[in-house]
Amino acid sequence: MKAYQRRFIEFALGKQVLKFGEFTLKSGRTSPYFFNAGLFNTGRDLALLGRFYAEALVESGIAFDVLFGPAYKGIPIATTTAVALAEHHDRDMPYCFNRKEAKDHGEGGTLVGSALAGRVMLVDDVITAGTAIRESMSIIQANGAALAGVLISLDRQERGRGELSAIQEVERDYGCRVISIITLGDLIHYLEEQPEMAQHLAAVKAYRARYGV
């Protein structure tokens, strides 16, 4: 596990974005942990979050031409990632996001920001069922662009309804890499280093054994 990944876990724990306990997911599964990126909700949070996204993106080595943040949660993520790439990695990249509803005045259309062209790096908080990715793909393809990759904060590494995770399905269906700041495996590795969190470690490992990919 990289140092920035450990810092991200501690950041998420400190903001209660990452919590341990018993949580019922939309899938009906009872999860021993919960991740709510919506609680990164201050200016400082967003500034730090962008640095973590930028770090993961640069480390991945994936070539891209524009960042795309799908409405709504992807919008601040794309924005802060673009700022962090420019400020900390000297990479001044264009970014773009979509509106849920088309605007019929001013610049019009459903896209805001840079043109959606070339190789698109899609940034979002998590992938649950892959629905948002499929919606974004229709926008990307309609603009004649191509999906270079997807970057999210956490890969839960768990099966969907079949044998694959939603992320593996996206990689299979669109032929791109999905990268994340951290994975469930990273989280388990972190818990193994924290003796005071041993009770959570057992529950998370049991969950991975049952639902993991």
From Swiss-Prot:
Tell me which PROSITE patterns the record gives. PUR_PYR_PR_TRANSFER
Q: What is its EC number?
A: 2.4.2.10
Q: Where does orotate bind?
A: 34-35, 128, 156
Q: What cofactor does its activity depend on?
A: Mg(2+)
Pathway noted in the entry:
Pyrimidine metabolism; UMP biosynthesis via de novo pathway; UMP from orotate: step 1/2
This protein's GO cellular component annotations are: cytoplasm
Among CDD domains, the record links this protein to: PRTases_typeI
What's a Pfam family in this record? Answer: Pribosyltran
Q: Which InterPro entries does the record cross-reference, listed alphabetically?
A: OPRT (IPR023031), Or_phspho_trans_dom (IPR004467), PRibTrfase_dom (IPR000836), PRTase-like (IPR029057)
Residue runs in coiled coils: none
GO biological processes = 'de novo' pyrimidine nucleobase biosynthetic process; 'de novo' UMP biosynthetic process; pyrimidine ribonucleoside biosynthetic process
Record-listed 5-phospho-alpha-D-ribose 1-diphosphate binding positions: 26, 72-73, 99-100, 103, 105, 124-132
Q: Establish whether keyword Cytoplasm is in the entry.
A: no
Which molecular function terms from Gene Ontology are attached? magnesium ion binding; orotate phosphoribosyltransferase activity
Keyword annotations: Glycosyltransferase, Magnesium, Pyrimidine biosynthesis, Transferase
Q: Which family does it belong to?
A: Belongs to the purine/pyrimidine phosphoribosyltransferase family. PyrE subfamily.
Please give the subunit comment from the record.
Answer: Homodimer.
Q: Which HAMAP family match?
A: PyrE
Function according to Swiss-Prot or TrEMBL: Catalyzes the transfer of a ribosyl phosphate group from 5-phosphoribose 1-diphosphate to orotate, leading to the formation of orotidine monophosphate (OMP).
Q: What is this protein called?
A: Orotate phosphoribosyltransferase
Per the UniProt record, the source organism is Edwardsiella ictaluri (strain 93-146)
This protein's gene is called pyrE
